[in-house]
Amino acid sequence: QMCIRDRTYVGPVVYSGFERVNVKKTDVPQVLGEDADITRYTSQTDTGINAIDPCVKTDDNGDMWMTFGSWFGGMWMFKLDPTTGLRDYNSTYPTEANKSDAYYGVKLGGGFGNSGEGSYLLHDNGYWYLFASYGALQQTGGYQIRMFRSKDITGPYADEAGNTAISTKAIGNNWQSDIGERLMSSIQWSGNDLSLIHI
């Protein structure tokens, strides 16, 4: 085991981008079963999920959760085992369109090629707040932070108008929509083609 400061590396928590030839090197067979059909997980046109941008939180019951993903594949979460910091293999999730997935867990937001990444959860006054970055990280990409809230850590998350954080279809430039409470945005000042300022 490799020690990183006061942390100890134990192993990967979730995988993405694997193929049929290397899936045995992941924990997918352990989660789904040795003979599970993994076709949807090896197709970028199906799930398109990236295992990036983790955020770990503990709920009021003492359960530990991790959110992650994904820009175009949606933001997801599943329960962790607090003794190992890895996935809680005793927790299972049904595969239901736009709600949950047997491997990736509970869907929190985004999906269908719409931007949405960097999920972060904050608990305050009885609500869980989901913060997510929309847009593209470039001068004209409209990179910004949107916020949704829920009474339950697993959602559903919605904005003040009742719009859900979960995308059920491709929207296009969803960062130009009015879904989610916009907190911060990128701007482009005329006469300055090289800067990006977040306000």
Model-inferred region functions:
Residues Q1, R5-I197:
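Carbohydrate-active catalytic/glycan-binding domains of CAZyme proteins
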